[in-house]
UniProtKB/Swiss-Prot annotation:
Keywords: Chromosome, DNA-directed RNA polymerase, Metal-binding, Nucleotidyltransferase, Nucleus, Phosphoprotein, Transcription, Transferase, Zinc, Zinc-finger. Its EC number is 2.7.7.6. Component of the RNA polymerase I (Pol I) complex consisting of 13 subunits: a ten-subunit catalytic core composed of POLR1A/RPA1, POLR1B/RPA2, POLR1C/RPAC1, POLR1D/RPAC2, POLR1H/RPA12, POLR2E/RPABC1, POLR2F/RPABC2, POLR2H/RPABC3, POLR2K/RPABC4 and POLR2L/RPABC5; a mobile stalk subunit POLR1F/RPA43 protruding from the core and additional subunits homologous to general transcription factors POLR1E/RPA49 and POLR1G/RPA34. Part of Pol I pre-initiation complex (PIC), in which Pol I core assembles with RRN3 and promoter-bound UTBF and SL1/TIF-IB complex. It is found in: Nucleus, Nucleolus; Chromosome. It comes from Pongo abelii. It comes from the Eukaryota. This is DNA-directed RNA polymerase I subunit RPA2. One of its GO terms (biological process) is neural crest formation. One of its GO terms (molecular function) is DNA binding. InterPro entries: DNA-dir_RNA_pol_su2 (IPR015712), DNA-dir_RNAP_su2_dom (IPR007120), DNA-dir_RNAP_su2_hyb_sf (IPR037033), RNA_pol_bsu_CS (IPR007121), RNA_pol_bsu_protrusion (IPR007644), RNA_pol_Rpb2_2 (IPR007642), RNA_pol_Rpb2_2_sf (IPR037034), RNA_pol_Rpb2_3 (IPR007645). GO terms for cellular component: chromosome; DNA-directed RNA polymerase complex; mitochondrion; nucleolus.
Length: 1136
């Protein structure tokens, strides 16, 4: 993570040179570094998880011990290895490695084999090591385990991938899946919180507490809280296997160290030696322990082990002390390795809790980015893998017990290898997690949610694809909250989260995106040398005594470890020295270290201290360090204590410490593609961030190798004439999303009201915004037959009259063939019976067969049973299709206007689009007006203008700049021209604003949404028309439609007709006397009578037939009456 290398060579301005370069389209020697950076957090976190992290996770799994035939058996996982994806052993093939393109095409999972070395021992004596296959786990594309790792673009193309393939996703059943980055509490940092809900946890509880999200090196996480009680004591709260436990703090402190009560008392009151209330509270906490007869550490451990062992599932031969040690290792400050460190951390948390309760320190905001980090894909993968490895050990014990019940099992290697195969397979749990995004865990992994962890990385267009890897979600549980505090954009997020790139609907403020310069720390470094460096700089070790009183010293914490104390006069100098070492790469201080000095203010503010963070999963961003003249990575917490300038004129000597690399560094990658976004109203930029991801563009270059369910393609994309410099930085011309259009702002017809727009029919005929949709269908004949039967293969019976030369000899359609509704689609044969089956094309939309891929099974031994047919559906713009500019100005195509009736300029130029001028005043999208002038001047002068935000100001006006360029080309300074009516040929009196604007066609098309039905299928139960466009269902007549008819006074006829006659009208027989719908039954006539002519109903309750009448009622009412009768509820009707 080099903070200085990435942003040094930003393009000074956009250019069209690369489009005219003869080498354009030839693969580079190396991939574009800027694009690879976008997925680096995903890829590098996974690399750490499957290499260093996997080794640490295996070491952290305790040996699994149990009793078997009066012997103590223990299993220990010594090592685990994940291998790159390969074909199964025994497969005959040239290439052993499996590549992602094959898994996409065959709709299978890109996965590697997980093997582990299991050591087994009897009564503590090692008996050997068994190498065991545990299952398959998904492999992230472009990670070190992927077969595409470090391949140059030419080699990637040869393996049917994009030249700029970025990776960062998994392939599950042929679908690309991304593990979503979630907001998590900052690890190993005590956060003071006030929550009224905590009062309900028990008698005497208050709303004050200190919470800590403890995370180990292998990312195992546990949440822990300290609660303040009304009597001044403190209760420790932790979670074990999703169960909440409470422990008085005194017991925890006494169990961790063998200190005397006086030493514990002295540690807890540091800095507040004269506070009588604190002294009494600490004395009371220690007195509670003494009252239980626990005066020594051993007695406390024995007491806690006896209380908790029933929940810990430890072996019976463990003494109570060992059970208590197991509890503290798994639940209390798990990020700390020694009990002494845990003791000092709990003391610090207690002091902070008392400061919060007494109003000496303010609460930390858990919704602020200062107290947050992100959950990376590698972190979730490693936590889940560790839990499943522990679960596998437990399943071996269960398999032992089952085997022992049936036969006499002896302990030897051969028997163990057989029993190991009976353990749980890790393949299905991983595939379930990635396929559904739902977490099945016994511990919860320290997460706040168990659903929505994975999303599909759909390639609707390249912008949408990029956004998946920069998205950060607050969490699914927060979406249900009624409060808006979690959605607010706080000042602390400046430079880390984009202020405009968030949805405008339900997930607004919950689904955010990282800025273009923001990075996620993924590397883990050992910090063993830093404590010694701190002591050399003047920090007093934790077991020493500072020269001044503790009230005038700051506590010093390094990654959640209490290192010592530092004099408040020395602290600023030490923080500056550490910052120098960090920027200059000296003293082995990592460049992503966060140095935070929270000063004493004498007022209720943040709890003071010197905090150092080097842990992964934090957000950092580069800024210019003005003192050293170099770039520095700063974190979210240290930023709030800095003075960061944006422009040069904002720098004040002695006050300003840092400066932004460029003004638009606060925007996300997608928001940086909006031209002149600083001239638009903020909501319009938000809309464009969303609509840019819905654009029908050019998402990839390997259409012939893809088997996605649906892909969009714009046939005639263009490079924008006006674009920000970041557009070129990310080489977006390789994946264009729109077309340069000549737009005239004029009310010319009545068809352009309410954001509608007129398109020149001649432009449409020349290919304006033409597109296609690629749909793929995966056909597997093995799903159509019974288990074990393999007699079905694709093919056709010669001379079959149903096919009529529509299909090839292999039973599949010809590539390039046009398909219509009812045409033969494919044919297959039963080899046993010789029977032929023909399936027909069922879609109402005509298509062209674009591609057919023949697939096989994992071993390559499958018969001709599986194909993937890709169809191309032409989708040229039609009335009702949606378009938008890059400024959130969306509208639908309302009319294709003949070119001879369109207005034209003096030079004979006819605009492509007529835009209603009423769309500007309320939307205030001045950026679109500037883009129109800039695009016009760019076309006239053969230039490509820079539309990067914040380059123009009131002093340096964009209107002046582009107006002068238009003037130099002989056009009006303000971008207006005289137009002539295409109908009358007369000159229009008003000056019309006309220019070039880059327009996008969105994926919302009438062809996908229109629905028409007269009569059709009905629901079997309610007899009402079924809903759904795919099944030719009815159109929903909802509450708004009902209210509209009521308001028009047509309830008697139209409303009755819609909701009754056209829905589920039925004629029912009712007894007028008893009012029952269920009692009238049809009497069976004598055999000699006609059953149709002599239909006679009789009331079974009244035993009369002259009281039967017919009424028209909804059929669903009859069903409702029958349901109530089943519940012993009678419905009586008054028939008038």
């Amino acid at each position: 993570m080099d903070p200085g290398s990435r942003w040094r060579n930003l393009p000074s301005g956009p250019s069209l040179k690369h489009l005219t370069d003869p080498s354009y389209g030839i693969p580079r020697e190396q991939q574009k570094a800027a694009l690879q950076e976008l997925t680096r957090a995903h890829v590098e976190s996974f690399n750490y998880a499957v290499h260093e992290g996997l080794g640490l996770a295996v070491q952290a799994i305790p040996p699994f011990e149990f009793a078997f035939k009066d012997e103590r058996i223990s299993f220990t996982i010594l090592d685990a290895v994940i291998s790159p994806p390969t074909v199964p052993k025994g497969t005959i093939c040239k290439e052993v490695s499996v590549y992602p393109a094959e898994c996409r095409g065959r709709r299978c999972t890109y996965r590697g084999k997980l093997t582990a070395d299991i050591s087994w021992a009897v009564n503590g004596i090692s008996k050997g090591i068994i190498k065991q296959f545990l299952g398959y786990v998904p492999i992230m594309v472009k990670s070190k385990l992927c077969n595409l790792y470090n391949l140059p673009p030419q080699a990637l193309i040869e393996h049917h991938e994009e030249a700029e393939e970025m990776g960062g996703y998994f392939i599950i059943n042929g679908i690309e899946k991304v593990i979503r980055m979630l907001i998590m509490p900052r690890r190993n940092f005590p956060i003071a919180m006030v929550r009224p809900k905590w009062k309900t946890r028990g008698p005497g509880y208050t709303h004050y507490g200190v919470s800590m999200h403890c995370v180990r090196e292998e990312h195992s996480a546990v949440n822990m809280n300290l609660h303040y009680l009304e009597n001044g004591t403190v209760m420790l709260n932790f979670i074990y296997r999703k169960e909440l436990f409470f422990l008085p703090l005194g017991f925890a402190l006494k169990a961790l160290v063998s200190f005397s009560d006086y030493q514990i008392f002295q540690e807890l009151i540091k800095g507040k030696e004269d506070d009588s209330f604190l002294r009494n509270s600490v004395s009371q906490m220690l007195r509670i322990v003494m009252e239980e007869g626990c005066s020594t550490q051993k007695q406390v451990l024995n007491y806690l082990g006896e209380c908790f062992r029933v929940k810990l599932n430890v072996p019976d031969w463990y003494p109570n002390e060992q059970a208590a040690e197991f509890l503290f290792n798994q639940c209390i400050c798990i990020h700390l390795k020694s009990n002494t460190e845990k003791f000092y951390m709990l003391c610090l948390m207690t002091r902070k809790l008392f400061a919060l309760a007494k109003g000496e320190c303010m609460e930390d905001n858990p919704d602020s980015l200062v107290n947050q980090e992100v959950l990376t894909p590698g972190q979730l993968f490693l936590m889940f893998l560790k839990e499943k490895l522990e679960g596998w050990l437990v399943s071996i014990k269960i398999a032992f017990d089952k085997k022992a019940q049936k036969t006499n099992v002896s302990m030897n290697t051969d028997n163990l290898m057989r029993i190991f195969t009976m353990g749980i397979d890790l393949t299905k749990p991983f595939e379930y997690l990635f396929a559904t995004g739902n977490l099945r865990s016994k511990t919860g992994l320290g997460l706040l949610q168990d659903s929505g962890l994975c999303v599909v990385a759909d390639k609707l267009n390249f912008i949408r694809y990029l956004s998946h890897f920069r998205c950060v979600h607050r969490g699914a549980d927060f979406a249900k909250m009624r409060t808006t505090t979690v959605r607010r954009l706080l000042p602390e997020s400046w430079g880390f989260l984009c202020p405009v790139h968030t949805p405008d609907g339900e997930p607004c403020g919950l689904m955010n995106h990282l800025t273009a310069v923001c990075e996620v720390v993924t590397q883990f470094v050992y910090t063993a040398s830093i404590p010694a460096l701190l002591c050399n700089l003047g920090v007093t070790p934790i077991d020493g005594a500072p020269h001044r009183s503790y009230s005038e010293c700051y506590p010093v914490l390094l990654d959640g470890v209490m290192v010592g104390w530092v004099d408040k006069e020395l602290a600023p100098g030490i923080a500056d020295s550490l910052r120098h070492f960090k920027v200059l790469r000296e003293k082995r201080i990592p460049p992503w270290t966060e140095v935070v000095l929270i000063p004493m203010t004498g007022k209720p503010s943040l709890y003071p201290g010197l905090f150092l963070f080097t842990t992964p999963c934090r957000l950092v961003r580069p800024v210019q360090n003005l003192e050293l003249g170099k770039e520095e990575l700063i974190g979210t917490m240290e930023q709030i204590f800095m003075n960061v300038a944006i422009f040069e004129d904002e720098v004040f000597a002695g006050v300003t410490t840092h400066q932004e690399l460029f003004p638009h560094s606060l925007l996300s990658v997608i928001a940086n593609f909006i031209p002149f976004s600083d001239h638009n109203q903020s909501p319009r930029n938000m809309y464009q961030c969303q609509m840019g991801k819905q654009t029908m563009g050019f998402p990839l270059l390997t259409y012939q190798d893809r088997s996605d369910n649906k892909l969009y393609r714009l046939q005639t994309p263009q490079s924008p004439l006006v674009r920000p410099s970041m557009y070129d930085y990310y080489d977006m011309d390789n994946y264009p999303i729109g077309t340069n259009a000549i737009v005239a702002v004029i009310s010319y017809t009545g068809y352009d009201m309410e954001d509608a727009m007129i398109v020149n029919k001649a432009s449409w005929e020349r290919g304006f915004a033409h597109g296609s949709v690629y749909k793929s269908e995966f056909i597997d004949l093995s799903e159509k037959i019974k288990q074990g039967d393999s007699s079905l293969v694709f093919g056709m019976k010669p001379g079959d009259p149903r096919i009529l030369q529509k299909l090839d000899d292999d039973g599949l359609p010809f590539i390039g063939a046009k398909l219509q509704y009812g045409d033969p689609y494919y044919s297959y044969l039963n080899l046993n019976t010789g029977e032929s089956f023909v399936m027909y094309y069922k879609s109402k939309e005509n298509c062209v067969v674009d591609n057919i891929k023949v697939c096989s099974n994992d071993t390559g031994s499958g018969k001709f049973k599986c194909v993937c047919i890709t169809m191309r559906v032409p989708r040229n713009p039609t009335i009702g299709d949606k378009f938008a500019s890059r400024h959130g100005q969306k509208g639908i195509l309302s009319r294709l206007w003949p070119a001879e009736d369109m207005p034209f300029t003096e030079s004979g130029m006819v605009p492509d689009i007529l835009f209603n001028p009423h769309g500007f005043p309320s939307r205030m999208t001045i950026g679109m007006l500037i883009e129109s002038m800039a695009g016009k001047s760019a076309a006239l002068h053969g230039l490509c203008h820079d539309a990067t935000p914040f380059i123009f100001s009131e002093e340096n006006s964009a209107l002046e700049y582009f107006g002068e360029m238009l003037k130099a080309a002989g056009y009006n300074f303000y971008g207006t021209e005289r137009l002539y009516s295409g109908i009358s040929g007369l000159e229009l009196e008003a000056d019309i604003f006309i220019g070039v604007v880059y327009y996008q066609r969105l994926r919302h098309m009438v062809s996908d949404k229109f629905q028409v039905r007269t009569t059709g299928a009905r629901d079997r139960v309610t007899n009402q028309p079924i809903g759904g466009r795919n099944v030719q269902g009815g159109i929903r007549f909802g509450e708004m439609e009902r209210d509209a008819l009521l308001a028009h006074g047509t309830s008697f006829f139209l409303l009755h007709d819609r909701l009754f006659n056209c829905s589920d009208r039925s004629v029912a027989h009712v007894c007028v006397k008893c009012g029952s719908l269920l009692s009238p039954l049809l009497e069976k006539p004598p055999p000699s009578w006609s059953a149709m002519r002599n239909r006679k109903y009789n009331c079974t309750l009244c035993n009369r037939s002259d009281t039967i009448d017919t009424v028209s009622v909804p059929y669903v009412f009859r069903y409702f009456v029958a349901e109530l009768a089943a519940m012993n509820i009678k419905v009586k009707l008054d028939v008038v």
